[in-house]
Regions:
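Multi-pass membrane glycosyltransferase architecture that uses lipid-linked
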Residues: 1-227, 232-234, 253-386
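Short aromatic-rich membrane-water interface segments that cap or initiate transmembrane helices
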Residues: 240-252
Length: 386
């Protein structure tokens, strides 16, 4: 005898709640343990802002680079920095509350998307678990204190609204770009999907970015220097295969290779938008970025994860390849940490092998996407289906 659909739905909801409860409990345990160098930047930037200092024009004593983003996440941190200063509760704990919220929002939107796309309770629970309980996601957010999932959640929600032809999609996409830079990489696909609403999308996106940046428009040159120039002049680093060139040629030639690859990436992002469904396009564009970026930090590997989960169930022909790539992203992001292995920050075998895997999976995505488009194409006039 089959299980009634209502009972099955309640059981699936209970399992999803359990996944969320376990994930939140693990995060609560990880949050107070430590914080990474990036989190020091959030701490110093929010402290300086509460003191009335323009952090773009007058940098606090950052341990590394500047706060290289538009100020949306900074605004989210301000009330928690104020609470830390007035209650004695550690900012390591309070400052990670928006990060925790980003993780939970990602899980909830991903679960809703899986439910809508598959109608499969098992897919909803398992897919949400793959993201929310992923060790790299846990390390990057709750442990280290990076806020990538805030931007990922906003982008996921914007795409969900865009597919439903909601005018508010532009608002949420603008917030995603204002949180972190990477959502702007998929702009060609967003524009393609927004047929009939492109002018509204442009107005909304521009308006959001102007409103978020308004307090710093008087120092816009300094802000753009921190956001754009700081990354543009970097040498290859971390998990990028371009680190293999360092020491074998001049740093100027290495940077030139990076600029050429950036140009190729921008061209590729436009061409992919003409050929792929939006979900596959976002995933393919982010994977292409992993190949072309001259700096590849483990946090970048979190960006494509929700779309890997979606493609896992919506593209069954390439399920094995998607599972393999998802596993590789997770393992590489964790193992390439010099604190847990002896090969340093950019181990040659890992960075070269991962680049090859990215290229292979990118080809798989494009080929499968084109095959699916061909299968869905209407028959020529007069042709009969076999």
């Amino acid at each position: 005898m089959g299980v009634p659909s209502g009972t099955a739905g309640q059981a699936a909801s209970a399992r999803l709640v359990l996944v969320l409860a376990v994930g939140i409990a693990v995060r609560v345990a990880l949050i107070p343990i430590t914080r990474g160098q990036d989190f020091e930047v959030w701490d110093l930037a929010s402290t300086a802002t509460l003191q009335g200092i323009d952090i773009y024009a007058h940098h606090p004593a950052y341990p590394g680079g500047p706060y290289a983003y538009l100020p949306l996440f900074l605004y989210l941190e301000l009330p928690f920095q104020w609470l830390a200063e007035h209650t004695g509760i550690s900012f390591t704990v309070l400052g990670k509350v928006p990060v925790l919220a980003g993780d939970i929002a990602c899980a909830l939107v991903l679960a809703a998307e899986l439910r809508d796309r598959t109608g499969n309770n098992r897919a909803v629970v398992l897919g949400t678990s793959l993201f929310f309980l992923n060790p790299l996601v846990l390390y990057n957010g709750a442990f280290y204190g990076r806020f990538d999932t805030v931007a990922v959640a906003l982008l996921l929600f914007a795409v969900r609204l865009l597919r439903r032809r909601k005018r508010s999609a532009g608002l949420w996409y603008g917030l995603a770009v204002a949180a972190k830079t990477f959502p702007v990489f998929v702009l060609p696909g967003i524009v393609r999907e927004a047929r009939g609403r492109r002018i509204w999308l442009a107005i909304t996106l521009t308006g959001v970015l102007l409103v978020v940046s308004a307090p710093y428009l008087s120092s816009w040159r300094a802000m753009m220097s921190d956001i754009v120039v700081y990354d543009a002049v970097k040498a290859p680093g971390a998990l990028s295969w371009q680190t293999l060139f360092i020491g074998s040629t001049s740093i100027e030639k290495v940077r030139l290779v990076g600029y050429v690859l950036l140009a190729l990436y921008l061209i590729g992002a436009v061409l992919l938008a003409r050929a792929l469904d939006l979900d596959v396009y976002i995933l393919a564009t982010l994977v292409l970025f992993l190949v072309c970026s001259k700096v590849l930090l483990e946090q970048y590997l979190v960006w494509p994860m929700p779309w890997l989960v979606l493609v896992l169930w919506t593209a069954p022909r390439i399920r094995a390849a998607t599972i393999a790539f998802f596993g590789a992203v997770t393992v590489v992001g964790m193992v390439a940490n010099p604190h847990i292995q002896p090969w340093g920050r950019s181990p040659a075998l890992i960075v070269a092998g991962f680049a090859v895997l990215c290229v292979i999976y990118l080809v798989v995505l494009v080929v499968d996407g084109r095959r699916r488009d061909s299968a869905l194409a209407p028959e020529p006039n007069g042709a009969q289906a076999k």
